A protein has these predicted regions:
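Bacterial N-terminal signal peptides
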Residues: 8-17
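Cysteine-dependent hydrolase recognition
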Residues: 20-502
Length: 502
């Protein structure tokens, strides 16, 4: 009954503001650019824009578009209106976009260049905007797209830049957008997060507000019944920080919830708790034998193509719009079924038994309550060689984690520049597993690695390298000081920590 009344109220609100719906506009400005030489070609780079393109075609800088739409509306078309066109001096041969390739493929690959595009005496791209879609974040309908302010004639080498671009999005009423309004949150923290994500936060004021419920709480823990009483230290930890916690079991959800399987019942329960009680965090207590995962489908267009229909993804439990399987087949998360804007934060304690759970709880509480202060500003970066064509290293991406950055279309504030950075970069020299172990043994708060991996291999280390004897200095500190190894290792690569394959 409560949700029926909510939907009725939202529909009435939308009727009142319908006269203001229909068109959303924003103007973007571009003044600075730089030209980078790459293997006899040129790359045109603009701060804050992502350099990309279709494989074999010119790689150009693209601006992201993230515009809040009127409540209950979806985006139906996008228009690019460029002005103050500036002709760049000289003639250019813009670098063709190359495909990503797994390390397992032999050789350096074939250099991709679409000759028909490069021989055409016409401006590229024919359409300046990318695909347009309507996404939803915490109840707000958002037009997602991109555009390039660059015009390029491959035949003549002429390049021009629009210094001002107006983007116009036309909207229309949509039932899916009305339904998404159920996910409007009363949390100021969530509203602030949405406002930082979008580019026209003033439009958010046209959305209905939601009052806090008397039953609101912050964090939900879902675990197996046998572990329900083992999370008190975690609950106390968060209560001390002003985060209220409730716990339930998968058995309760399975017996009382709705859905075709346990994973869907858990997701539906999370949706109810988010909409009715305002939760912002979910902790899944247990590995997949205790709390199931949802396997997603993906086809990667690289080389001969790679396909997987069972990629474990807890994003299913945090991105709460839609069903992730609109056509009810055996492929979850196909194109058009996905929801890549999560409403809440979801984490998982991947334990199988009580011993592992107690260890994870001990590490979690000790890390927050008793940090090793002398190591807090010590960080190790480990970057491998990634690809030859174009030449790419992990260090290219690791450097973007330091301080303020606005590369690739994202604005980030990373690890403070005042920290001590210990860098193992193959861009400047070789390094080995022994070098990385020495860094860990020296005491590092964060270890960030970008390279190649598999389910049993990472950072030049295999399963056999994870032995006590290889981390003797850490263990010596633990024995003498009754503390423990306090270090996070974060890795960006393919199938690392692929626990489903073990």
């Amino acid at each position: 009954m409560r949700k029926s009344l909510l939907l009725s109220g939202l529909a009435f609100w939308i009727t009142l503001i319908a006269a203001h719906a229909g068109i959303v506009e924003k103007t973007y400005q571009f003044t600075d650019f730089k030209i980078q030489q790459e293997q006899g070609y040129q790359l045109i780079q603009i701060d804050g824009l992502l350099l990309t393109g279709l494989v074999g075609e010119p790689a150009l800088p693209y601006q992201d578009v993230k515009l809040v739409l009127p409540p209950g509306e979806r985006a139906v078309s996008i228009e690019f209106i460029g002005s103050d066109e500036m002709l760049l001096s000289g003639s250019y041969s813009v670098y063709p976009q190359q495909p990503s390739r797994p390390l397992s493929e032999p050789g350096n690959g074939i250099f991709q260049k679409n000759e028909s595009v490069y021989q055409a005496n016409s401006f590229y791209p024919a359409q300046s905007t990318g695909q347009l879609q309507t996404a939803y974040l915490n109840g707000y309908a958002i037009a997602i797209s991109s555009f390039t302010p660059i015009k390029y004639n491959p035949s003549t080498g002429q390049v021009s830049l629009y210094q001002n671009v107006k983007i116009r999005v036309v909207t229309e009423p949509a039932s899916k957008s009305t339904f998404a309004l159920q996910n409007i949150s009363s949390s100021e923290r969530i509203k602030s997060r949405v406002s930082r994500f979008v580019q026209n936060e003033a439009m958010m004021k046209t959305y209905p507000s939601k009052a806090k419920s008397g039953n609101d709480y912050d964090m939900l823990i879902i675990t197996a019944a046998q572990f329900e009483n083992e999370f008190q230290d975690v609950i106390d930890l968060y209560l001390q920080r002003g985060i209220s916690v409730q716990i339930t079991t998968k058995e309760t959800i399975n017996s009382q919830g709705t859905g075709q399987d346990l994973a869907e019942k858990i997701r539906n329960y999370i949706i109810d708790q988010y909409q009715d009680n305002g939760i912002e965090y979910v902790l899944l207590g247990g590995d997949v034998e205790h709390v199931p995962y949802r396997g997603f489908y993906c086809y990667v267009q690289s080389g001969g193509g790679y396909e997987d229909s069972d990629i474990p993804a807890d994003l299913y439990y945090s991105a709460l719009d839609g069903t992730w399987n609109d056509d009810n087949d055996n492929r979850w998360g196909e194109i058009g079924e996905d929801d890549l804007l999560p409403e809440i934060a979801v984490a998982r304690f991947s334990f199988s038994n009580l011993t592992e759970l107690n260890s994870m709880i001990h590490k979690t509480t000790s890390y927050q309550d008793n940090p090793v202060l002398g190591e807090f500003n010590e960080t190790t970066f480990a970057g491998e060689w990634l690809y030859s064509n174009p030449l790419t290293y992990g260090s290219d991406y690791l450097e973007l984690l330091i301080g303020y950055q606005n590369e690739n279309g994202y604005e980030t504030w990373g690890i403070p520049e005042t920290y001590n950075f210990h860098k193992l970069y193959e861009s400047t020299g070789s390094w080995s597993a022994a070098d990385l172990r020495a860094q860990i043994n020296a005491g590092r708060q964060y270890v960030h690695h970008v390279g190649h991996a598999n389910s049993t291999y990472v950072a030049y280390m295999s399963n056999g390298d994870i032995q006590y004897r290889n981390f003797f200095l850490v263990l010596t500190v633990w024995i003498l000081n009754y503390t423990f190894f306090q270090s996070w290792m974060w890795c960006l690569m393919i199938v690392t920590a692929s626990w489903k394959k073990w």
